[in-house]
Amino acid sequence: MVRYADDFVILCKTEEQAKAALEAVRAWVAEAGLSLHPAKTRVADARREPFEFLGYRFDKGRRWPRDKSKRKLRETLKPHLKRTGGQSVQAVIGRINPTLRGWFGYFKHAEAAAMREIDGWVRMRLRSLLRKRRGRRGRGRGDDHHRWRDAFFANLGLFSLEQARDLACQSMKMAH
């Protein structure tokens, strides 16, 4: 047995089953001379109470990346998306794509809306960078969406989380 079990979730159909499972885990852990952390151990109805686990937020049967996970991704990408970086947009895209692919690899089971939100933020930062190159201030919004459409960034090779998720979902449907 491992010295400690950091995080795990047990899903049951009824509250009685959940309580029985909790007691079984308590006994199993006690046999090893360990104990469950009281503040982190609970029986909850996942249909009514959202819970967070391993970077995801589970809410009403849906999976979302935790706000903390999205914030960390933005913090990782920001240094590459600075308006004063002096690199071509293609070079910037080349630097951020591996991070986006890795993040998608872990969060590919999250809701499409979460992917759309991150994609939009990345494109807004890239539009802002392009505005700066034209001697303009501000964020990449409004008319910039017409000037530099999403397809513009796709043609430059920007990895789209939403498109990757759509493809992954299609592949899963085809397999069944």
Predicted regions and their residues:
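Non-catalytic terminal/accessory segments
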Residues: 1-176
